[in-house]
Amino acid sequence: MAVPPSAPQPRASFHLRRHTPCPQCSWGMEEKAAASASCREPPGPPRAAAVAYFGISVDPDDILPGALRLIQELRPHWKPEQVRTKRFTDGITNKLVACYVEEDMQDCVLVRVYGERTELLVDRENEVRNFQLLRAHSCAPKLYCTFQNGLCYEYMQGVALEPEHIREPRLFRLIALEMAKIHTIHANGSLPKPILWHKMHNYFTLVKNEINPSLSADVPKVEVLERELAWLKEHLSQLESPVVFCHNDLLCKNIIYDSIKGHVRFIDYEYAGYNYQAFDIGNHFNEFAGVNEVDYCLYPARETQLQWLHYYLQAQKGMAVTPREVQRLYVQVNKFALASHFFWALWALIQNQYSTIDFDFLRYAVIRFNQYFKVKPQASALEMPK
């Protein structure tokens, strides 16, 4: 769950310090263009080019020297004394620094260093494949290289969104259109399997075998978690939600809004892969509550959801949709939102054990588990339209 930067302010070369993100856009500005409603992609992704690899390891506790070595490889024409840097501190999976020369940041390299033991949570080779796949469909920035413990990629112009922004109809329409576009990326004609159950089972196994003895009393017992995981798989697998290519981690700051071009793009593809359509949407709806100060009173109301889902389905189908189709997806999404709570709660328990990032992962896990049990009766009672 790394979160992206907004544009850094110019600053002295070769120094890192904490900054407050600087907004890059005017929220009163109307979009110049809306994403096309016809978002279908042709079967089979274009062939991706090979990605450069450098045998450099960047010290996560002292990122700058390693980042500058990478910049010498990627931008040899940049004079070292002119390189400006900014470290971003919002991420809760990885560490991120931007390197650039010009104030307008038209050419800016982001250096991302993987978090401690995140290989337990993320398939890094798969992440690179996803990055290339999305780039081939014009849904991702350029991937410049990988290195021993991270990767470098293009800075995407725009502003990272906050919870208050994704509730704005003009913006959530753009988000729905972009998600519909990504969901139409095909798997080379093969029948993809959802990654949800495999990943959740792996996370649960880690919690059970490596973390269980030290679990807080505020966390449900392992036996309860095992029972709930089985219940989720049994009930959600029956909903017939289509398996599509999903982002799977669409929190606010993974959405970049470009007010000049009038579109949004998604970043951070660590958890991307083929999964249930309704999981990706339900997970995004959960993120309306935020991450640092979680408030589930901000979970989108039924009418907001129906409008969002209408935009999504219309973009996906390229034609008018019926109220029944929207209602069907509404039920699926709110049931799969339960799986989202469970997934990220398990994830947070693992991060709490291994991560060196300054974030209260245990508190976050407890919040997600509590919300899971709170909304489970209501979500379970939802019925598919006849």
From Swiss-Prot:
Which reaction(s) does the protein catalyse, per the Swiss-Prot or TrEMBL entry?
ethanolamine + ATP = phosphoethanolamine + ADP + H(+)
Q: Name one GO molecular function term.
A: ethanolamine kinase activity
- Residue runs in coiled coils: none
**Pathway involvement of the protein, from the record:** Phospholipid metabolism; phosphatidylethanolamine biosynthesis; phosphatidylethanolamine from ethanolamine: step 1/3
Q: What is its EC number?
A: 2.7.1.82
According to its record, what are the GO cellular component terms?
cytoplasm; cytosol
Q: Name one Pfam family in it.
A: Choline_kinase
For this protein, the record's InterPro entries field holds: Kinase-like_dom_sf
Q: In which tissues is it expressed?
A: Expressed in kidney, liver, ovary, testis and prostate.
Sorted keywords for this record are: ATP-binding, Kinase, Lipid biosynthesis, Lipid metabolism, Nucleotide-binding, Phospholipid biosynthesis, Phospholipid metabolism, Transferase
The GO biological-process annotations, alphabetized, read as: in utero embryonic development; multicellular organism growth; phosphatidylethanolamine biosynthetic process; placenta development; post-embryonic development
Name the family: Belongs to the choline/ethanolamine kinase family.
What biological function has been recorded for the protein in this entry?
Answer: Highly specific for ethanolamine phosphorylation. Does not have choline kinase activity.
The record, for PANTHER family, names: CHOLINE/ETHANOALAMINE KINASE, ETHANOLAMINE KINASE 2
- The name this protein goes by in its record: Ethanolamine kinase 2
Top-down, what is the taxonomic lineage of the species of origin?
A: Eukaryota, Metazoa, Chordata, Craniata, Vertebrata
